[in-house]
Amino acid sequence: MAISKKMLTTFVLTILLAVSFVHCSDRTSGVGINQEYAKCYDLADCQKPKVDDAACERFCGAKSFLLYGKCDTATNKCCCKSKTK
């Protein structure tokens, strides 16, 4: 049984497509381009004189379990940052 030129071309193109898809896919958690997330929000609990880091931690944790929060006393804002690097 001979392999036709059309069948061989189809097979090669399928393999190339599969390989390029695997290289471009970022479905594995923890693999790929990691970016540091940092964003600050106005939160009443971070206003002076009452600075409540626990409230900021809860606020950021509600946005995503990958974030932690800390009140920035210089700007009076709650800053959420990523736990992973």
Swiss-Prot record:
GO cellular component: extracellular region
Classification lineage: Eukaryota, Viridiplantae, Streptophyta, Embryophyta, Tracheophyta
Protein family (similarity comment): Belongs to the DEFL family.
Domain of life: Eukaryota
Subcellular location(s) per record: Secreted
Keyword Secreted included in the entry's annotation: yes
Protein name (database record): Defensin-like protein 112
A GO biological process held by the record: defense response to fungus
Signal peptide boundaries: 1-24
Keyword flag Transport: no
Disulfides per UniProt: C40-C80, C46-C71, C56-C78, C60-C79
Keywords in alphabetical order: Antimicrobial, Disulfide bond, Fungicide, Plant defense, Secreted, Signal
